[in-house]
Structure formats: structure tokens, C-alpha cells
């Protein structure tokens, strides 16, 4: 009970043939076969090693302006112009 026997599959096949017709079913199966072939071809292409890229040097870098380095920071930072400084004179 509940098992799918060969007769169940035959009935399902007949119903599909009646609903879609012979032309649609064969067209659908042809599309499935093309998809499987494309998948297999893609897998075969992936397995083959790809041709190595020719030894190319990187493109030359155009020097428009020389790079400047900043001297290391020394001392305390200068107070901001609008900051008030409270000092006791004493």
C-alpha cells in the first residue's frame, strides 16, 4: 500500500502523453538532453588545465609627481585656534 508499482508509472505516462501530446514531450526530452550535454561539456572543460598566461611584465607606472615622505611627528600638538587655555600664573 502506498508503493509505486510499474502500473502507476504507466498510468502517469499515459496521462502526461494525453495532456502534452507527443510533440511536446519529445521536445521537452530534447531540451533536457541538450542541458545534460552542456553540463557534461562544462565539467570536462573545467577539468582541463588552462593555458598559462604569457610572462608579461606589469604595465609601467607613470610617475607624475614624486612621492614625498613626512618627517616623524615630534612634540605636543598645537592647541586649536578657538580653544581656550587656562593657565594659573603664580
Swiss-Prot record:
GO cellular component, one term: TAT protein transport complex
One Pfam match: TatA_B_E
Cellular compartment(s): Cell inner membrane
A Gene Ontology BP annotation from the UniProt entry: protein transport by the Tat complex
Protein topology in the membrane: Single-pass membrane protein
Membrane-crossing residue ranges in chain numbering: 1-21
Cysteine disulfide links: none
Main location per the UniProt record: membrane
Annotated family: Belongs to the TatA/E family.
Function (record text): Part of the twin-arginine translocation (Tat) system that transports large folded proteins containing a characteristic twin-arginine motif in their signal peptide across membranes. TatA could form the protein-conducting channel of the Tat system.
Annotated NCBIfam families: PRK00720.1, tatAE
HAMAP family: TatA_E (MF_00236)
This protein's name: Sec-independent protein translocase protein TatA
Gene: tatA
Amino acid at each position: 500500500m502506498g508503493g509505486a508499482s510499474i502500473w502507476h508509472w504507466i498510468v502517469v505516462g499515459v496521462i502526461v502523453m494525453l495532456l502534452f501530446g507527443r510533440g511536446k514531450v519529445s521536445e521537452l526530452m530534447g531540451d533536457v538532453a541538450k542541458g545534460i550535454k552542456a553540463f557534461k561539456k562544462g565539467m570536462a572543460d573545467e577539468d582541463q588545465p588552462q593555458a598559462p598566461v604569457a610572462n608579461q611584465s606589469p604595465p609601467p607606472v607613470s610617475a607624475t609627481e614624486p612621492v614625498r615622505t613626512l618627517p616623524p611627528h615630534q612634540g605636543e600638538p598645537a592647541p586649536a585656534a578657538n580653544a581656550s587655555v587656562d593657565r594659573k600664573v603664580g
